[in-house]
């Protein structure tokens, strides 16, 4: 028995297909989904969705959104997403280093909008880098 998975971003159908297992990065932690899962709507954090089909894992970098789980169907609506195999690992790693370097100019206790944006860029770059490695 398989789960029907759709990952949708504005103007883009990122992924549509079956999966035996889905792991979602929710704002409260990872959610593992198997066939027959209880109904659930959850916020999706910046992170990596992992799906397993035929013993093969696929990663998708997600940039925040929502997911609806209904028995054997998962619909993920996100701001943007990229399939890991389509991300250049070297470019993703360089973007992560650049994002980490940008945060170093802020004092540790600062809570400015600029620092929050820089931290968000680190999260995005980390998600892309992690997804690119799988």
From Swiss-Prot:
Record's subcellular location: Cellular thylakoid membrane
GO CC aspect terms: plasma membrane-derived thylakoid membrane; proton-transporting ATP synthase complex
One Gene Ontology MF term: proton-transporting ATP synthase activity, rotational mechanism
InterPro entries: ATP_synth_F1_dsu/esu, ATP_synth_F1_dsu/esu_N, ATPsynth_dsu/esu_N
Keyword terms of this UniProt record: ATP synthesis, CF(1), Hydrogen ion transport, Ion transport, Membrane, Thylakoid, Transport
Glycoprotein among keywords: no
Domain of life: Bacteria
Membrane topology category: Peripheral membrane protein
HAMAP family named among the record's database cross-references: ATP_synth_epsil_bac (MF_00530)
Database matches in NCBIfam families: ATP_synt_epsi (TIGR01216)
Function: Produces ATP from ADP in the presence of a proton gradient across the membrane.
Subunit structure and binding partners: F-type ATPases have 2 components, CF(1) - the catalytic core - and CF(0) - the membrane proton channel. CF(1) has five subunits: alpha(3), beta(3), gamma(1), delta(1), epsilon(1). CF(0) has three main subunits: a, b and c.
Similarity section: Belongs to the ATPase epsilon chain family.
Protein name: ATP synthase epsilon chain
Source organism of this protein record: Prochlorococcus marinus (strain MIT 9515)
């Amino acid at each position: 028995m398989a789960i029907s998975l759709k990952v949708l971003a504005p103007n883009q159908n990122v992924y549509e297909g079956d999966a035996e297992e889905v792991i979602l990065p929710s704002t409260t932690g990872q959610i593992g989904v198997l066939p027959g899962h209880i109904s659930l709507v959850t916020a999706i954090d910046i992170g990596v969705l992992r799906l397993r089909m035929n013993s093969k894992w696929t990663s998708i970098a997600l940039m925040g959104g929502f997911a609806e789980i209904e028995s054997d169907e998962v619909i993920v609506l996100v701001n943007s997403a990229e399939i890991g195999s389509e991300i250049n690992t070297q470019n993703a790693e360089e973007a992560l280093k650049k994002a980490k370097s940008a945060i170093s100019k802020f004092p540790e206790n600062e809570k400015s909008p600029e620092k929050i944006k820089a931290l968000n860029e680190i999260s995005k770059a980390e998600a892309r880098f992690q997804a690119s490695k799988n």
